[in-house]
C-alpha cells in the first residue's frame, strides 16, 4: 500500500515538474527508492540523466562510520561504499575500501584492528539504521544530510562520486529488477 501511495505522489510531483521545466536536476529520496527513480525516469518526458535517487549514500555513510569505529579513526579518513538497493539488501564493497589510502588489510595490520568480515559489517550497517529508528522513531536526519550532500555536489558540479540510483539505457542500476518485469 505504501509503495502505491509513494508512486502516486512521485507521479503527481513529476507531472507538476514537467509542466514547468525539463532541465533541472531531480534528487529523489522516497522509498522504495529504486522503483520511484524508475517511475520518474521512464514515465515522463524528462532527461533520464537528470533524475537520481540518493541510492546507498546513507548506507555508505553508516558503513564508513562502522569501519572508522573498528579502526579508531575519523569517518572522514574512510573511503567505502555500500552497493545494491538502499536498505537491508545493500552490501559492503570492502575490496575497494580504504583508510587513509591503505586497503583494509593494510590498515588492519598498521592500525591494529581485526580484519573485517563482510557479513558482519553488512549486518552492523543494517542494524545501525534500526538502532536510529528505534531510538528516535524516524531516520530523517541521515537521509537529509545525504540528499543535501548530493544536491550540493550537483549544484557545484564538483565531480564527487556518490552511490546513486539512476536509470541508464532503460535499465535500473544496481541489483533491483525493473518494476515491470
Set out the residue ranges of the language-model regions.
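Rossmann-like NAD(P)(H) cofactor-binding subdomain of soluble oxidoreductases
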Residues: 2-64
Amino acid at each position: 500500500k505504501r509503495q502505491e501511495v509513494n508512486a502516486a505522489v512521485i507521479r503527481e510531483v513529476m507531472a507538476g515538474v514537467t509542466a514547468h521545466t525539463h532541465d533541472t536536476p531531480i534528487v529523489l529520496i522516497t522509498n522504495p527508492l529504486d522503483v520511484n527513480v524508475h517511475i520518474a525516469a521512464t514515465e515522463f518526458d524528462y532527461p533520464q540523466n537528470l533524475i537520481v535517487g540518493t541510492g546507498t549514500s546513507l548506507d555508505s555513510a553508516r558503513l564508513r562510520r562502522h569501519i572508522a569505529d573498528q579502526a579508531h579513526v575519523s569517518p572522514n579518513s574512510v573511503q567505502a561504499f555500500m552497493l545494491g538497493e538502499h536498505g537491508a539488501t545493500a552490501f559492503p564493497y570492502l575490496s575497494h575500501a580504504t583508510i587513509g589510502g591503505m586497503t583494509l588489510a593494510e590498515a588492519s595490520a598498521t592500525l591494529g584492528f581485526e580484519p573485517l568480515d563482510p557479513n558482519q559489517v553488512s549486518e552492523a550497517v543494517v542494524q545501525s539504521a534500526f538502532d536510529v529508528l528505534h531510538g528516535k522513531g524516524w531516520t530523517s536526519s541521515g537521509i537529509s544530510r545525504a540528499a543535501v550532500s548530493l544536491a550540493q555536489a550537483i549544484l557545484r558540479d564538483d565531480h564527487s562520486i556518490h552511490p546513486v540510483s539512476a536509470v541508464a539505457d532503460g535499465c535500473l542500476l544496481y541489483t533491483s529488477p525493473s518494476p515491470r518485469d
